[in-house]
Curated annotation (Swiss-Prot):
Protein name: Formate-dependent phosphoribosylglycinamide formyltransferase
Cellular compartments per GO CC: cytosol
Record key words, sorted: ATP-binding, Ligase, Magnesium, Metal-binding, Nucleotide-binding, Purine biosynthesis
Functional summary from the UniProt entry: Involved in the de novo purine biosynthesis. Catalyzes the transfer of formate to 5-phospho-ribosyl-glycinamide (GAR), producing 5-phospho-ribosyl-N-formylglycinamide (FGAR). Formate is provided by PurU via hydrolysis of 10-formyl-tetrahydrofolate.
E.C. no: 6.3.1.21
Amino acid sequence: MIGTPYTEGARRAMLLGCGELGKEVAIELQRLGVEVIGVDRYPNAPAMQIAHRSHVINMLDAKALRAIIELEKPHLVIPEIEAIATQTLVEMEAEGLNVVPTARATQLTMDREGIRRLAAETLGLPTSPYFFCDTETEFNQAIGKIGVPCVVKPVMSSSGKGQSVIRDVSQSAKAWQYAQEGGRAGGGRVIVEGFIPFDYEITLLTISAVNGIHFCAPIGHRQEDGDYRESWQPQAMSADVLAKSQAIASKVVEALGGYGLFGVELFVKGNDVYFSEVSPRPHDTGLVTLISQDLSEFALHVRAILGLPIPNIHQHGPSASAVVLVEGKSKNIRYQGLADALAAENTQLRLFAKPEIDGRRRLGVALARDKDIESAVNKALDSASKVKVIF
């Protein structure tokens, strides 16, 4: 049962994290009559602009997080970022709080160690070789064992922060320092992974719903500096590789538990599929589903967490997304060139309405459909390039 917002019978959902992905989740929640409460570390975040009400707190502060949940008494708590005091969610879930998909899933995936050990050591899934390191000495020893090239990441980071590829041991000291600067909690533990010379990487959006496990068509993407630049759907792959990918994704999602959409990241090399990472929430590369599917990843996430069925997912054909990435400093961001950006057939644009920029930030995404993937990617890139950001 779902009541009406602002009434005694309202179904209340609290978003922990109010960025561009949280904004789309909020929109889908409101389409089904849910009262939305936005929480983030800074004011006027994208989802806050459309939520029924919002709060600014440090979500890594356990006392502050507990206090805001006890104040609002939400029926659902939906983590949309990793930088949260997850132990508080675990404790409150034991007291009866409904955390999406589960507090355990949120805690396991907030750092790379928890999910990697679950995938490789508990579930026995194929992954790259890896070591976790607390000191620079351990770090150098791990590089010696794995060899170069190898990949270094803080165990807690997002959007590529602190990640680097070591192609020669002379780069080790710089990579260690960069990883220490890029972690969400400051310096700390890192993972050193063997470099898989993959043919391509995919995000397999996997939904655990009341009527079973469902998959979106695989999404291909291009990364730069650890963050996505373009994504496309469907990624061409053989039926055998797709089946292997779905089997891996199913095992991970079922092990994490709960209802919701999960972004499962996989590497493909020939006929081999390797598990990389998973997010228990909509994935940035999945922004392409805003134009490629009848139900976007956000709509699917909301259906699942509300306990509603997903009878089918229709994919419209070759589609792509390209980010609007800007570098600068401003608290008065404006946009020009929108008419040119939207002049071509089957193009759409999402501007995230982020309140400020200080450095490099993703401010929007262009979306396109076309006769084939290459054409769709080029159309999305062309559209994104025509958006002019004025400071």
